[in-house]
Each structure stands twice: as structure tokens, then as C-alpha cells.
UniProtKB/Swiss-Prot annotation:
Pfam families: Ribosomal_S13. The gene is rpsM. One of its GO terms (cellular component) is cytosol. Belongs to the universal ribosomal protein uS13 family. Residues 106-121 have a biased composition (Basic residues). The keyword Repeat does not apply. This is Small ribosomal subunit protein uS13. The lineage of its organism: Bacteria, Bacillati, Bacillota, Bacilli, Lactobacillales. Part of the 30S ribosomal subunit. Forms a loose heterodimer with protein S19. Forms two bridges to the 50S subunit in the 70S ribosome. Residues 96-121 are annotated as: Disordered. GO terms for molecular function: rRNA binding; structural constituent of ribosome; tRNA binding. It comes from Streptococcus pneumoniae serotype 4 (strain ATCC BAA-334 / TIGR4). InterPro entries: Rbsml_uS13_C (IPR027437), Ribosomal_uS13 (IPR001892), Ribosomal_uS13-like_H2TH (IPR010979), Ribosomal_uS13_bac-type (IPR019980), Ribosomal_uS13_CS (IPR018269). GO terms for biological process: translation. Transmembrane segments: none annotated.
Amino acid sequence: MARIAGVDIPNDKRVVISLTYVYGIGLATSKKILAAAGISEDVRVRDLTSDQEDAIRREVDAIKVEGDLRREVNLNIKRLMEIGSYRGIRHRRGLPVRGQNTKNNARTRKGKAVAIAGKKK
């Protein structure tokens, strides 16, 4: 297994798919990285030379991934909560942030439904 940005990527998959195991790298970014490094998307990770692995590492190091990206996202959410914006208030209350209705659904954000005593008749 090759190690890129602190993540073990699978050996038996194509490089373009294996790179998506790194947080912050999707399929589009993976393709851009390989194009910049001059590596074919069809190559398997186990077939990469050490020079090719180093080229991929250099390209990935130029992008904000893994811990740095997670930290930035968390700081952005914290900043929204501190300034008291609508989105920050929704984050603080654990409700959907992007305008979804909450009358019936939104169970993922709100948690398990709590039964109200005396409601059933």
C-alpha cells in the first residue's frame, strides 16, 4: 500500500480511484493531480514507480487535504456560530443549515424522535 498524505491507498485499484481515499480528493481532483503529474489514470497503484509516487505526493502536498481541510471546515463553522449568522444558529441548534423543511423530516440532524406523553389517542 502506498502512503499519500498520511493515508494508505489500496494497491489493487487504479490510481485515479485510490487517490479518492484521501479526504478532500474526489474524482475530479484526482484526475487533475494525475494530469499534472503526467501519469495515466489506468495505472494500478502497485505498478507505480517511486518517481511517479513522489510526483503524486508533490501534487497532493500543494492541495489542502486531510487534517488541514478538516480543521479549516471546523473553524469556518465555529466562525459562523460566533458571529451569530443564520447558518451559525442552525449549526448551534443542530438543525439543517441549507433551507430544508423540518416539520416532518430532518431526522439525521435532529436525532431520534422523542415521544410526547399524552399525545396518542
